[in-house]
Curated annotation (Swiss-Prot):
Its EC number is 2.2.1.7. Pfam families: DXP_synthase_N (PF13292), Transket_pyr (PF02779), Transketolase_C (PF02780). Binds 1 Mg(2+) ion per subunit. Binds 1 thiamine pyrophosphate per subunit. PROSITE patterns: TRANSKETOLASE_1, TRANSKETOLASE_2. Belongs to the transketolase family. DXPS subfamily. One of its GO terms (molecular function) is 1-deoxy-D-xylulose-5-phosphate synthase activity. Homodimer. This is 1-deoxy-D-xylulose-5-phosphate synthase. The keyword Ribosomal protein does not apply. It is an enzyme of class 2 (transferase).
């Protein structure tokens, strides 16, 4: 049946039996396609019936359907004519793992950052009203996990006050990555577990209407006290006191029930909450049985067993996890904070060892930072483990709540740099630029597992201001020994390679973090051409160490190589430091051009950006040649462009 679905219109005349068959076929399709490419399997298995109902009740794209976070939009893509493209899911030039405005008019929003859908919906509803399109409904699908984010409640406050026809579908599966936590989750759990009072009321209506003479009068009396009965039976006052109509809870795997609830909500003409209870990983035993995250996201797997087909090597995240536990055993002041991602950020083992010292604050990065500030004020040393891309959400709190007070908060930034297959909104290429403007901030970028452990320990010893460590996604690789260390403490830099005997000190090549191995490969290529290169790992990359300046003074050219946007990164910081020190040494930066990148593998993206060792060596050769010929600075730049 799925092959016959070219768009939402093809769903309108299907029978209940056909819809059930289609739902089963969609699940089978998802399991086999995502098993081959990797992706967000569990969330999509849980929204099959919900997505079918949405596209039968609402007229997309006339009625925008906005999926918060967007990782649960695979079924939406299939029903809007893209099922035939799933072989290319998350591959270069293929189907995005999130909604994509360039793919389809049915996709309105493509950022994968959570808790934003309701604000988009509020703005769209205002725009439709102002432009006279009052017959358009706006639908926002938001998970119970995303409702732990404060932005959702700011939007709910505005939506409720407006009275505009926004339908908010709460996809309640009790989880984000991990089980949802907090007061909102407790309210939703209570609603899920209570008897369905709407069913009880309906039975009462039917019985009263059947009574002779007094039936209609008794029914009216009952209807008049309905609100009081609802208030005593369940805590949906959480929504109704805001001025939002509440419909539910509805079995999210009963397509007809969901459809009826959505049609009911559509008819109100004002803001409505439709509470849909789903099961993440529904219909696939390996996902349903996965206690950790119900296969929220997976790599390539065996579709029968759900087991990974490739065993990953030692990873950066696991290395951090083990190191943090080791330090925490020695120091009771070390605590950890996660924003609803204890598993992906490596904090689950920490929580198992020290359950009273791990705080999951929900999808609330801003609160996480200020709560960490409070913990630090109280004598703790908090470690906030977060994906680099989500650090952006807490900039004001880092600046004004942590740094202004010179508090010892350590931020551990996982998935820094190019992450690849999840696309533009997951690349962690902004953190160095953001943190570089924060007074008193020290940032480390370990090149290997040994340095991660060392630099984490150094960060935990800092008691007069914030620190951050950044590392990429994936395997950590072999340790890279240093020839020597110049300087001490956080100012110490590791020399990884020196010019060959008889070569000049032509280039100081600064390899930042995970780019250190590439810097060494570049140096070998340059040595073959007779160019003398000193390779250093600055370890603590911001602020720029005096040891870097001392080394720079002995070379003809400084080149920085980093997995960050070039604007405001380490290269910018080194150039500024050289100017302040009045060192007349030219500096060139190699990094990521400041733009949004489509999904592809990390290797493919780096190759496209000419960030391979061969490409970088070629560029440096040109720069050295231009300097050696005495060409004016303007001509050098023209040559490099």
């Amino acid at each position: 049946m799925l092959e016959q679905i070219r768009g939402p219109a093809d769903l309108q005349h299907l029978s209940t039996h056909q819809l059930r068959e289609l739902a089963a076929e969609i699940r089978e399709f998802l399991i086999h396609k995502v098993a081959a490419t990797g992706g967000h399997l569990g969330p999509n298995l849980g929204v099959v019936e919900l997505t079918l109902a949405l596209h039968r009740v609402f007229d997309s794209p006339h009625d925008p359907i906005i999926f918060d976070t967007g990782h649960q939009a695979y079924v939406h893509k299939m029903l809007t004519g893209r099922a035939h493209e799933f072989e290319s899911l998350r591959k270069k030039g293929g189907l995005s793992g999130y909604p994509s405005r360039s793919e389809s008019e049915h996709d309105w929003v493509e950022s994968s950052h959570a808790s934003a859908a309701l604000s988009y919906a509020d703005g769209l509803a205002k725009a439709f009203e102002l432009s006279g399109h009052r017959n358009r409904h706006v639908v926002a699908v938001v998970g119970d996990g995303a409702l732990t984010g404060g932005m959702c409640w700011e939007a709910l406050n505005n939506i409720a006050a407006s009275g505009r026809p926004v339908i908010i579908v709460v996809n309640d599966n009790g989880r984000s990555y991990a089980p949802t936590i907090g007061g909102v989750a407790d309210h939703l759990a209570t609603l899920r577990l209570q008897p369905a009072y709407e069913q009880a009321l309906q039975r009462g209506r039917d019985a009263l209407r059947a009574l002779p003479l007094v039936g209609k009068f008794a029914y009216r009396v009952m209807h008049s006290v309905k609100a009081g009965i609802k208030d005593s039976l369940s805590p949906q006052l959480l929504f109704t006191d805001l001025g939002l109509k509440y419909v539910g809870p509805v079995d999210g795997h009963d397509e007809r029930a969901v459809e009826a609830a959505l049609r009911h909500a559509r008819g109100f003409g004002r803001p409505v909450i439709v509470h849909v209870v789903t099961r993440k990983g529904m219909g696939y035993a390996p996902a349903e049985d996965d206690e950790a995250d119900q296969m929220h996201s997976c790599g390539v797997i065996d579709p029968v067993t759900g087991q990974a087909t490739k065993v990953a090597g030692p990873g950066w995240t696991a290395t951090f996890s083990d190191a943090l536990i080791g330090y925490a055993r020695k120091r009771r002041d070390i605590v950890a904070i996660t924003a609803a991602m204890p598993g992906p950020t490596g904090l689950t083992p920490f929580g198992q060892q020290f359950p009273d010292r791990l705080f999951d604050v929900g999808i609330a990065e801003q609160h996480a930072m200020t709560s960490a500030a409070g913990l630090a004020m109280g004598g703790m040393h908090p470690v906030v483990a977060i994906y680099s891309t989500f650090l952006n959400r807490a900039f004001d709190q880092i600046m004004m709540d942590v740094a202004l007070h010179r508090l010892p908060v350590t931020m551990v930034l996982d998935r820094a740099g190019i992450t690849g297959s999840d696309g533009a909104s997951h690349n962690g290429m902004w953190d160095l630029s953001i943190l570089g403007v924060v007074p008193g901030m020290r940032v480390a970028a370990p090149r290997d597992a040994a340095r991660l452990r060392e630099e984490l320990g150094e960060a935990l010893d800092v008691d007069d201001g914030p620190t951050a460590l950044r590392f990429p996604k994936g395997d950590v690789g072999e340790d890279i020994p240093a020839i020597e260390r110049r300087g001490s403490g956080l100012s110490g830099v590791d020399v990884l390679a020196l010019p060959a005997s008889g070569c000049n000190h032509d280039v100081l090549l600064i390899g930042v973090g995970a780019f250190a191995p590439m810097a060494l490969a570049v140096a070998r290529r340059l040595a073959d051409q007779g160019i003398g290169v000193t390779v250093v790992d600055p370890r603590w990359v911001l602020p720029v160490s005096d040891s870097i300046l001392e080394l720079a003074a002995r070379h003809k050219l400084v080149v920085t190589c980093e997995d960050n946007g070039v604007n405001g990164g380490v290269g910018s910081a080194v150039s500024a430091a050289l100017r302040r020190a009045e060192l007349d040494v030219p500096c060139r930066d190699v990094g990521l051009p400041q733009r949004f990148y489509e999904h592809a593998s990390r290797g493919e993206l780096l190759a496209d950006l000419a960030l391979t060792d061969q490409d970088i060596a070629r560029r440096i050769t040109g720069w050295v040649a231009a300097l050696g010929s005495g060409v004016a600075e303007a001509e050098i730049r023209e040559h490099l462009d």
